[in-house]
């Protein structure tokens, strides 16, 4: 049998052993996908149910609004008729009539919106197969589908639980197999311990220097963004600032350098970077948002209000106080200020006043862009009112500009408008009319909130608090970091500072070493280009070595079916107690040693080379006795591993030369014959004792099997007269196929059964593998292919089929 055929047999065995894992993994993935699809369908069905509920609510609102509209129309018509029939209508009657008309118009607008909403919902429901004219029937059908989908989801989840349980069982089998190979892994670990220590030390050193490496990378990026020389005063100042922030705050120097890059990309110069970096870091620690978001907001407000670099810290404090004193969060405040800040600057409103307006609107649940557009509309309408807005303000007696044409303080204007409403005792409808005329439909609600906040003094209090907020962000960060988490961050920052300092000291040497290595690699590349043939030969040799390593690794997989068989023995005899389990595990570990890597063997040999040289002959005599004792005790078990022997023949031949060279290298020291005999006898005794311990599970299993056979015989399940059928069938099988020829159908040598895991004979019976031969002589001879010849073949085949049918009917066969 060739080496390629051997490898194919091994790979096929591995594939068959791993097939249950693959099938269960595939089933698990399929079930998970089905569950996701069912969950998606269930969400869609629940969405349809929500649409039905929304349609009903909207329809109910439409009906109520329709009744109210009809009533308002009747009242307006009655008032109009009364007003027309009155000779001298009063001003109060005119106002009442106008109010009734406006109420009817508002109800008509609301009725139209609800009608459009109902039609839109009808179209959406129709798109998913729900008819609103037969809503109760379709809703019941939808509920039935939801119930069916829910039941299907529960069934799929139960199936997934069962598959997961099977996966857990197979994983337990695999873990037992891995435990059997643990001894081989320990041998490999001994050989790799020195390399592992060196690698761990190297990785620890690299990890310690990594903060300095990353800090240097970010400094180079910052230098490229701002466009200055590496040794310039600007870069030195920025680097010094980043290091100081890393040493004195919870942020690291790497974080500070990252913030500097973000501010530089936002358009900041060196002075702006130095001013904004500490503020950005503190804001990020305080509001737990990214440095990119905080830097963008900070620099955006600085640009919108056209403030100098020395005001950047104050801007950060105002923003932090806004989030702490009002209901505004980071996203809402950022969106609102994006809309309001440019208009506020043109209207002469400070950043503190703008933040107060945004915070007050967030307290009233007008958030994000709605707060921004509302504030912007209020500022722009009051800064330069035109048309009806101007007339309305004039009627209220409110001036928006002073004698020089400059816009008066916005808060003062809002207070005067609220005071005018109260002075003239305007009703809510009249106030709403003025608000819509002055500020527009969308901004009227925001204007009402701001007028109330201005009249109650809330805006003034917030503005005063924001103006006195210097240093509040740093104070907030100190409070938030005054705990174990903050101490850990400070420790991490200090640790990274150590790595940065070490990297700074070694950067020159490391760069020189790397550059030198690069030069040598380039020289090697040039040599390869000049010597293509030789380089190709080296590549072929390396590929052959890799293939040899793969073959040796595949040989280790032979242990899998053997371990499976031993596991089956342990499972069948588990009731025999902890002693059997312990010894059975020892057997499993011993067989797992088949897969010892060659590298681990070499490492073990090298580790003990000096001791072996000194005590070579006593050691060799001792282990020679051990091997002799093991061979004598394991002779009956040898046939079990006979199919594995040819696999190791080729590997043994290749290693024999290397082993002979190693023996010659360590020139053994001679010992006396008596000493060697004593060592050999001791080895024989040790080997026999070891073999007895390893044979204990098999002996116990044989006793268990004998007991089961006795019970089955007494019950009449088996017949003792059939004891010799195994030997008879084996002789027939050997005589039929011969010996020494490879049979691909069973992947084994003739005369040996293919390996199967050993199992307890619970309910199994004899499988007839004999072959019948019939010799029929006819006088006169019969040529092959004639009608008589075909009739004989048909008769024999029919006889064989009937025989197999009778055997199956008797229930005495497993096949």
UniProtKB/Swiss-Prot annotation:
UniProt-listed PANTHER family: FELS-2 PROPHAGE PROTEIN (PTHR37813:SF1)
This protein's source sits in the domain of life called: Viruses
- Report the sequence similarity comment from the record: Belongs to the P2likevirus tape measure protein family.
Q: What is the documented function of this protein?
A: Serves as a base for tail tube protein polymerization and acts as a template for tail length determination.
Q: Which residues form a coiled coil?
A: 67-163
- Organism of origin is Escherichia phage P2 (Bacteriophage P2)
Q: Its Gene Ontology biological processes? A: viral tail assembly
**Protein known as:** Probable tape measure protein
List UniProt keywords, sorted A-Z: Coiled coil, Viral release from host cell, Viral tail assembly
Signal peptide (UniProt feature, chain positions): none
Q: Does the keyword DNA damage apply?
A: no
- InterPro entries attached here? Phage_tape_meas
